[in-house]
């Protein structure tokens, strides 16, 4: 019976001996954890996020202006039945994607998340392209969020210059993220709590209004049979709402990035992921059902819903219908919270992604440095500068800003594609290398149907972003809409040609479990 060393670079006193027979009996993930501490390097992020933080971040990432504002246009476009069907389909897709991400993140809870998984399980070129694309997306989205915050603030203080509010929000979220990851987690926890309470109150008020207990006339389900309802515009309209619904769920993948700083990822990630399905059902499907019951799809207010006119947010309209005073002001405060939360999450996600890219050798080593509190401050400063410059272009050069936003428009969907592909490869490699699925700490649902269905729906959403532009051969609109795709391809091809990478054979895929980012020189 041969004896082998299990670790490299470990002192004789700390080395472990395990027989080959015993090694075969150990679960693959336990082996790496025997010397996990020995592999840790200086300047790592800190694992200070608790289960409640991850659960609320997963929830908060799927509740925002997409629900509070854009849900009205979904009902107006496809009718109550079409709107519900589109959100159910997108919710199912997101659930499968999150269970796929959860399986990988529980096995390897690192800040690089799906970009790192693409590198390990598919092709380093894919991880490189996804990482930089995702970082750029959130850096630009940061500018969008602080601009939206200024629009929301004009509801109360229309005479104050908008840039003051934008700069104020940027400074606040920078300071929050610069403190500790726990400060970020606590901030997100309470902002998500505000959104959750708002939706719960809305559902209660909405149900009471439907039955006529509040707001006078009982609407019941009459709006589902009103004129052309429940399905309006047929399949094209439903496909159009897929796009709206898809954007509404953007950000749910953040839970994968927070896994890198979770104190107990084996416990926190499965719990957060398992709650996604019920939360999507409760907060999205039921909320849209309530709106559809109370407000007919023909209402012009639904089509015009946007952050600049909170008075016609579907949530505001329902609260006003129930006779609640100051509904618009309250919803404006909630939407402001959502915008700040999105900006806060964007700052966090982009700084961690840039940090991870540096660790992997795909970004300057300068950005892999962290403070004594585990904050990748240099990466955060770089992200803030890019976001601030993008914001300045929104004022000084609107056309440039439009193209910057277009360049990041589909990045979230591309990330979702990467999650589905990476998980499919991970599971196949896991089995190919002789492991039993039961060894995994968390199992994705309905594999391989789940990730394949998510992949197909995601491609459908990307393709359907602007079908009208193709019909009318509007090449400028096509370029603006789909600019993210060629940019992603350029990054992918550049890395592939420079480093001559290939699709990693299944029997060579590294499926080992680790909780630390591995430096690649």
Language-model segments: residues:
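Membrane-interface "cap" regions at the ends of multi-pass membrane proteins
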Residues: 3-72, 76-81, 94-99, 111, ...
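Helix-loop-helix junctions that connect adjacent transmembrane segments
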Residues: 40-45, 84, 157, 161, ...
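Extracellular loop-to-transmembrane helix junctions
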Residues: 45-46, 51, 70-166, 173-175, ...
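Membrane-helix boundary/coupling elements in multi-pass transport proteins
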Residues: 110, 133-147, 246-262, 325-365, ...
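Helix-loop-helix connectors at the membrane interface of multi-pass transporters/channels
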Residues: 115-125, 146-166, 198, 258-267, ...
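TM-loop-TM module centered on a large, flexible mid-protein loop between adjacent transmembrane helices
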Residues: 116, 123, 155, 241, ...
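Membrane-interface loop-to-helix entry segments
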Residues: 163-221, 250, 273-277, 281, ...
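C-terminal membrane-solvent junction of multi-pass transporters and transport-like membrane proteins
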Residues: 190-191, 366-377, 416-480, 502, ...
């Amino acid at each position: 019976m041969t004896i082998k060393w299990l670790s490299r670079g470990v002192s004789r006193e700390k080395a472990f001996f395990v027989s080959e027979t015993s090694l075969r009996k150990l679960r693959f993930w336990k082996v790496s954890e025997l010397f996990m501490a020995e592999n840790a390097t200086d300047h790592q992020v800190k694992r200070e996020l608790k289960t409640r933080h991850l659960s609320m971040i997963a929830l908060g990432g799927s509740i925002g202006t997409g629900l509070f504002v854009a849900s009205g246009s979904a009902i107006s476009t496809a009718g109550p039945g079409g709107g519900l069907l589109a959100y159910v389909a997108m919710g199912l897709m997101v659930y499968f994607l999150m269970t796929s991400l959860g399986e990988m993140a529980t096995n390897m809870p690192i800040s690089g998340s799906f970009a790192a998984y693409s590198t390990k399980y598919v092709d380093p070129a894919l991880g490189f392209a996804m990482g930089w694309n995702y970082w750029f997306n959130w850096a630009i989205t940061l500018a969008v969020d602080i601009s939206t915050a200024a629009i929301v603030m004009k509801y109360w203080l229309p005479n104050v210059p908008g840039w003051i509010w934008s700069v104020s929000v940027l400074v606040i979220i920078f300071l929050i993220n610069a403190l500790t990851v726990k400060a970020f987690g606590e901030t997100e926890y309470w902002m998500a709590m505000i959104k959750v309470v708002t939706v719960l109150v809305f559902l209660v008020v909405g149900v009471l209004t439907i039955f006529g207990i509040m707001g006078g006339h009982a609407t019941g389900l009459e709006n589902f049979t009103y004129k052309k309802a429940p399905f309006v515009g047929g399949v094209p309209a439903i496909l159009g709402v897929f796009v709206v619904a898809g954007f509404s769920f953007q950000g749910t993948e953040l839970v994968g990035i927070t896994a890198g700083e979770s104190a107990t990822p084996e416990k926190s990630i499965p719990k957060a992921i398992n709650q996604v399905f019920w939360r999507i059902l409760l907060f999205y499907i039921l909320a849209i059902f309530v709106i559809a019951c109370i407000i007919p799809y023909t209402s012009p207010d639904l089509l015009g819903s946007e952050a600049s006119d909170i008075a016609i947010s579907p949530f505001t309209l329902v609260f006003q219908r129930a006779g609640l005073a100051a509904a618009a002001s309250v919803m404006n405060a909630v939407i402001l919270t959502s915008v700040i939360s999105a900006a806060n999450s964007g700052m966090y996600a982009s700084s961690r992604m840039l940090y991870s890219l540096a660790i992997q050798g795909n970004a300057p080593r300068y950005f892999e440095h962290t403070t004594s509190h585990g904050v990748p401050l240099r990466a955060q400063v770089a992200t803030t500068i890019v976001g601030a410059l993008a914001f300045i272009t929104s004022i000084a050069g609107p056309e440039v800003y439009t193209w910057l936003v277009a360049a990041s428009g589909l990045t979230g969907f591309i990330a979702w594609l990467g999650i589905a592909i990476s998980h499919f490869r991970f599971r196949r490699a896991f089995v190919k290398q002789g492991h039993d699925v039961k060894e995994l700490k968390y199992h994705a649902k309905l594999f391989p149907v789940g990730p394949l269905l998510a992949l197909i729906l995601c491609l459908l959403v990307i393709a359907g972003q602007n079908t009208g532009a193709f019909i009318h051969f509007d090449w400028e609109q096509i370029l603006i809409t789909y600019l993210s795709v060629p940019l992603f391809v350029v990054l992918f091809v550049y890395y592939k040609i420079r480093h001559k990478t290939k699709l990693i054979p299944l029997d060579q895929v590294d499926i080992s479990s680790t909780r630390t980012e591995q430096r690649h020189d």
